[in-house]
């Protein structure tokens, strides 16, 4: 069964959600991030998706204290993205408690550096590919690179890449359903790579459809905050996995 990965997006140490990656369309949610992470872990999730939105914009991690607090609160895997622009930042993220690191802008703009990270950290590195109109968006989705997700995968797959999170920016935060056909096409083209669906999840029915399509992982964010998907829903799904 498809693995559900709840998301916690961070700005100024708080839980937020953007719409289509627009920093001007921000909604702040109540609650302490570490407490929310603990609720997810209690529901039985194996991994939590953490995004440092301040870091993505600044090019440096900005919410590492929150990561430390979450890592102290839960024992599940933590994947972290945002602001990982150089090796010192990557090491700081791992030191703060992340089990996996997501590199998007570096993979697109400094591929030689991402290759070094793959060689050093192996499966702990995740390729983050944020797609808008078929092109890769970088630096907090504020710019675009003249590359496709296929270009990136073909480059890094021979070097040991195991996972890629692909976000369809046009669906992100919209609660309109995922771009299932995109992920099915990618999974078919690169069967040895584990693709994570990100963007648009609005209901458990979306998740069931992705599962039937043979996809392996899905990130759920706004649908949980807006109570379209409950922690009970997630717990029941995981119990049946």
Task: Label the model's feature ranges.
Residues 15-61:
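N-terminal beta-alpha supersecondary unit
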Residues 8, 52, 105-106, 129-131, ...:
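Short secondary-structure boundary segments
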Residues 74-100, 181-220:
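Catalytic cores of alpha/beta
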Residues 41-44, 94-95, 157, 211:
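Non-catalytic positions within long, well-ordered alpha-helices that form the structural scaffold/packing
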Residues 13, 19-24, 91, 98-172:
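Conserved anion-binding
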Residues 3-7, 47, 75-79, 99-102, ...:
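Structural preference for beta-strand elements that scaffold enzyme active sites
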Residues 3-4, 55-71, 85-91, 105-126, ...:
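Active-site-adjacent beta->alpha loops and helix N-cap segments on the catalytic face
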Residues 29-41, 85-91, 144-155, 207:
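Short, acidic/polar
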């Amino acid at each position: 069964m498809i693995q559900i990965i709840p998301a916690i997006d961070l700005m100024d140490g708080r839980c937020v959600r953007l719409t289509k990656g627009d920093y001007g369309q921000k909604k702040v949610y109540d609650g302490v991030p570490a407490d929310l992470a603990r609720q997810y872990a209690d529901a039985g999730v194996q991994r939590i998706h953490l995004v440092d939105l301040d870091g993505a914009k600044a090019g440096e991690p900005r919410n590492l204290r929150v990561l430390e607090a979450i890592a102290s609160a839960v024992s599940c895997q933590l994947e972290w993205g945002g602001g990982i622009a150089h090796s010192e930042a990557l090491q700081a993220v791992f030191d703060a408690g992340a089990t996996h690191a997501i590199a998007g802008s570096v993979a697109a703009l400094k591929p030689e550096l991402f290759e070094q990270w793959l060689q050093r950290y192996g499966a702990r590195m995740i390729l983050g590919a944020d797609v808008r109109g078929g092109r890769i968006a970088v630096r907090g989705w504020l710019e675009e690179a003249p590359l496709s997700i296929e270009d990136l995968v073909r480059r890094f797959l021979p070097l040991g890449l195991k996972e890629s999170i692909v976000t369809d920016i046009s669906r992100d935060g919209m609660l309109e359903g995922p771009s299932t056909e995109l992920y099915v096409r990618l999974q078919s083209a690169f069967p040895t790579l584990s693709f994570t669906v990100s963007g648009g999840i609005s209901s458990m029915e979306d998740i069931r459809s992705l599962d039937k399509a043979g996809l392996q992982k899905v990130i759920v964010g706004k649908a949980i905050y807006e109570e379209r998907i409950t922690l009970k829903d997630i717990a029941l799904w995981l119990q049946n996995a």
